[in-house]
Amino acid sequence: MIFSVKAPIPGFESIKEVELEKFDDFFVKFISKSDTTVFTLINPFMIRPYEFEVPEYFRALLDINEKTNILILNIMIIATPIETSTINFIAPLVFNVDNGSVAQVVLDANLYPDFCLMESISKYLNKEKSE
């Protein structure tokens, strides 16, 4: 499915349309249809508790209501070794699957102090190993 970018993605303002390619329950490839940009996205709910309120501005922009089918994914920077990879939890990508729109929502760090811009995935890999 092609998604229309409704608000510029910081640092990637030229991206107007994107396509998602699912790898598995954890990972999704974010492919720009406007240029050659490709991101690896991760389903945050697979690795940690992750809950936030989509701000009213973005709910209106993406036409989100209580019945809307939404998808939340986070940008992951893949590194070698994998334990040094990072995830951006403070600025999730919110997809309205019903109307094919997306925006990156930069959350208020004061309201969500547990969400970081570059959180190491090792924090979650080690947790899974110890359980």
Label each PLM-derived region with a short phrase.
Residues 1-49, 67-131:
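Long, compositionally biased stretches
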Residues 56-66:
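Short active-site loop/helix that positions an aromatic residue
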Residues 52:
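Residues that recognize and position ribonucleotide moieties
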